Regions:
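Asparagine-centered strand-capping/turn motif at beta-strand->loop junctions
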Residues: 1-5, 292-298
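Active-site neighborhood of thiol-dependent amide/isopeptide-bond enzymes
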Residues: 103-108, 112-190, 195, 213-224
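Intrinsically disordered, low-complexity Pro/Gly/Ser/Thr-rich segments with frequent PxxP/GP/PP motifs
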Residues: 43-57, 312-336
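Short, solvent-exposed loop/turn segments enriched in Ser/Thr/Gly
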Residues: 283-290, 303, 318, 331
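Intrinsically disordered, low-complexity N-terminal segments that are enriched in acidic
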Residues: 1-68
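Active-site rim recognition segments
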Residues: 174-272
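Short acidic, flexible loop segments centered on an aromatic residue
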Residues: 12-18, 144, 298-314
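Acidic low-complexity segments
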Residues: 38-42, 50-141
Length: 336
């Protein structure tokens, strides 16, 4: 992270998070963030306060258990509408994309179109990539990398009325020609997912690898080789995944290291509470204060309720609800 300003600033970095295909344990974050929050796409974003002209390296260590079968997730009407919107690189309102979407009109047909009509360009992996976006790659179908395969799928799906978004992260491959990686110098990967209303789940697919492997099915059967770092749904450009946080002079460095193992130690969430009440109050006026719930563990803490009791005050018992808290995050509750 870098603050080029002459004044302090708050900035943030995305860390790998739980989603319907993976469970994440964060063993350590150094230095510890001032807070971690969950954005609209479920990403965990760690916040840092940087002094003027300060650079800060953040080291995150952890593990993840990856599944090939997604967990269910119900979307609200507002969420579905969000995942149908046109974005900078997902130009769902583009006339050509709208025409194709009307003809294809299903996730599988859209997937097949992307696989069969784009050509993977391995020469672009070594270059500083200019992201073409969905509309751009339709003008040059012979020069696509994983970003364009993903962008075109997302744009076509959204234009067809199918909620869709992109995933960026690590994909385990032993054959870079058949299963290439082409996102950032850390050689990450990008793939799309669409929402299946019948299954009530986000379904990940990989048109890039189906194209480059010559037909291995990455639509009906997913694998254990994809580990998401970030999900982009509300914004086609943000957040940036681990490996994408580069400052001048570090663009060729490798910041992400992943090893595959069968060992995964599941942890239970651990919460702590502190209070912020005034030491004195005026008689007849309501007593208000804050209760800070902190997640001191490395795993996601689920929604729950905390009971607040008082011996000589009314009400004598209050139940305060709070939403999920990510590792090293906190919630501030108001009690009165």
């Amino acid at each position: 992270l870098q603050n080029k300003n002459l004044f302090p600033t708050i900035t943030e970095i995305a860390i790998p998070s739980d989603n319907n295909y993976q469970s994440v344990v964060i063993d350590s974050i150094n230095p510890k963030p001032i807070d971690v929050y969950i954005d609209a796409d479920g990403n965990w974003l760690a916040k840092y306060r940087l002094l003027p002209s300060e650079d800060q390296d953040v080291l995150v260590k952890g593990g993840a258990r990856v599944s090939y079968k997604p967990r269910k997730e119900t979307l609200t009407k507002e969420q579905k509408e969000t995942y149908l919107k046109s974005q900078k690189y997902w130009d769902a309102d583009n006339p050509e994309i709208k025409k194709l979407a009307r003809e294809l009109n299903s996730p599988e047909k859209i997937f097949e179109y992307v696989v069969n009509n784009l050509k993977y360009d391995s020469t672009r992996v070594k270059e500083t990539q200019v992201r073409a976006g969905a509309g751009g790659v339709l003008k040059n179908k012979n020069s696509a990398v994983c970003l364009e395969f993903t962008d075109l799928f997302v744009a076509l799906a959204r234009s067809a009325g199918i909620p869709a978004r992109s995933v960026e992260g690590y994909a385990n491959t032993s054959n870079s020609s058949q299963r290439p990686l082409s996102l950032f110098k850390d050689v990450l990967h990008s793939w799309p997912e669409y929402y299946d209303a019948k299954l009530q789940a986000w379904i990940m697919v990989d048109p890039t690898w189906q194209n480059t492997t010559g037909g291995i099915d990455y639509f009906n059967v997913f694998d254990f080789d994809h580990f998401a770092f970030v999900i982009k749904g509300t914004n086609s450009e943000y957040p940036v995944p681990a490996g994408g946080y580069k400052i001048p002079g570090q663009k060729s460095t490798q910041d992400v290291r992943v090893s595959v193992t069968s060992a995964f130690v599941k942890k239970l969430p651990g919460l702590s509470a502190s209070t912020n009440f005034s030491k004195s109050y005026l008689g007849g006026l309501p007593i208000k204060g804050e209760i800070i719930i902190s997640n001191d563990s490395g795993v996601l803490a689920p929604n729950q309720t905390v009971a607040v009791s008082a011996e000589k005050l009314s009400p004598s018992l209050q139940n305060l609800y709070f939403d999920k808290i990510p590792p090293f995050g906190k919630k501030v509750l108001t009690a009165s």
